[in-house]
Amino acid sequence: MSKDDLIQFTGTVIELAPNATFRVKLENGHVIIAHTAGRMRKNRIRILLGDKVTVEMTPYDLTKGRVILRHQS
């Protein structure tokens, strides 16, 4: 699967879970589980409760995703 196949959504972090995992409510109302992308871990970008984030998901599993960007507040 190429990067072109990934779908991007914007959402808000509603719950923090262990191991850099978050529950994110998307703008369309769906709630998914997302983990932090490797680049964000490497650069030590912190994600807090209520942060607005961009999540990328595969079309095969729309319940899980990867946080790729934290929007400035």
Swiss-Prot record:
Residue span(s) of domain S1-like: 1-72
Any one GO CC term of the record: cytosol
Phosphoprotein among keywords: no
Pfam families in the cross-refs: eIF-1a
Keywords, alphabetical: Cytoplasm, Initiation factor, Protein biosynthesis, RNA-binding, rRNA-binding
Transmembrane parts of this sequence: none
GO molecular function: ribosome binding; rRNA binding; translation initiation factor activity
Cited Gene3D superfamilies: Nucleic acid-binding proteins
SUPFAM superfamilies attached to this UniProt entry: Nucleic acid-binding proteins
Keyword Protein biosynthesis carried by entry: yes
Compartmental location: Cytoplasm
The protein's assembly and partners: Component of the 30S ribosomal translation pre-initiation complex which assembles on the 30S ribosome in the order IF-2 and IF-3, IF-1 and N-formylmethionyl-tRNA(fMet); mRNA recruitment can occur at any time during PIC assembly.
Protein family per UniProt: Belongs to the IF-1 family.
Function: One of the essential components for the initiation of protein synthesis. Stabilizes the binding of IF-2 and IF-3 on the 30S subunit to which N-formylmethionyl-tRNA(fMet) subsequently binds. Helps modulate mRNA selection, yielding the 30S pre-initiation complex (PIC). Upon addition of the 50S ribosomal subunit IF-1, IF-2 and IF-3 are released leaving the mature 70S translation initiation complex.
Record NCBIfam families: infA
HAMAP family (alphabetical): IF_1
Protein name per UniProt: Translation initiation factor IF-1
Biological source species: Rickettsia bellii (strain OSU 85-389)
